[in-house]
Amino acid sequence: MSALRLIVGLGNPGPEHAQTRHNAGFRFVDALIERSGARWALDSKLFGETAKVEVAGQPVWLLKPATFMNLSGKSITAALRFWKIEPEHLLVAHDELDLAPGTARLKFDGGHGGQNGLRDTIRLLGHGKFHRLRVGIGHPGHKDRVVPWVLGRAGREDDAAIGAAVDAAIDVLPLAMEGNFNEAMKRLHTEKK
């Protein structure tokens, strides 16, 4: 499996969206920034904020699109082109309705599963052959409640669980950085007793 060179967190920009469930991807890359001591810098040609950090001694670019969720592919494809990175070296972190808060899952390839940031990225790339980190936010129970759910803030317990899932994903990230994605998946997906 290919080593990672670009990690993107999906979300919506602006303080009004900062703590929403939909910004679980932003939360992941922000946690990486916090651990590394790096800082975000706005890069208008890439339509987002960028930073370069090291994980397990490997350099990796981080990106937070400033395009709003539904247009995330514009920023992601611009970054891939600019840094000459193939999609197989890309990890996109995003919120996942179909996983409970406290759960995070890695996968490679597939569809968008209704996630509009992934939908736009797949549309612009022409395929879904890239890595994903799915951060569980839970489902409100009925499809009519999805929009207010993802754009709303999680309660204290769910928020703590989402934070724990982000931390668990960061803990296995060195394996993925080294190209050992299957082992990273195995460790992340194994329930802690």
UniProtKB/Swiss-Prot annotation:
- Give the principal location in a single coarse category: cytoplasm
What positions does the entry give for tRNA binding?
H17, F68, N70, N116
Query: Which GO terms of the cellular component aspect does the record hold?
Result: cytoplasm
Catalytic activity reads: an N-acyl-L-alpha-aminoacyl-tRNA + H2O = an N-acyl-L-amino acid + a tRNA + H(+)
Instruction: Name the active site residues.
Output: H22 (proton acceptor)
User: What keywords sit in the KW lines?
Assistant: Cytoplasm, Hydrolase, RNA-binding, tRNA-binding
InterPro entries in the record: Pept_tRNA_hydro (IPR001328), Pept_tRNA_hydro_CS (IPR018171), Pept_tRNA_hydro_sf (IPR036416)
EC annotation from Swiss-Prot or TrEMBL: 3.1.1.29
Name the residues annotated as site: Discriminates between blocked and unblocked aminoacyl-tRNA.
N12
Record-marked site positions (Stabilizes the basic form of H active site to accept a proton): D95
Q: What class of enzyme is it?
A: hydrolase
Q: Which GO terms describe its biological process?
A: protein quality control for misfolded or incompletely synthesized proteins; rescue of stalled ribosome
One Gene Ontology MF term: peptidyl-tRNA hydrolase activity
Instruction: Say what the protein does.
Output: Hydrolyzes ribosome-free peptidyl-tRNAs (with 1 or more amino acids incorporated), which drop off the ribosome during protein synthesis, or as a result of ribosome stalling.
Per UniProt, subunit arrangement is: Monomer.
The cross-references to NCBIfam families, in alphabetical order and at most eight, read: pth
Record's protein name: Peptidyl-tRNA hydrolase
Q: Which organism is it from?
A: Xanthomonas euvesicatoria pv. vesicatoria (strain 85-10) (Xanthomonas campestris pv. vesicatoria)
- What is the gene called? pth
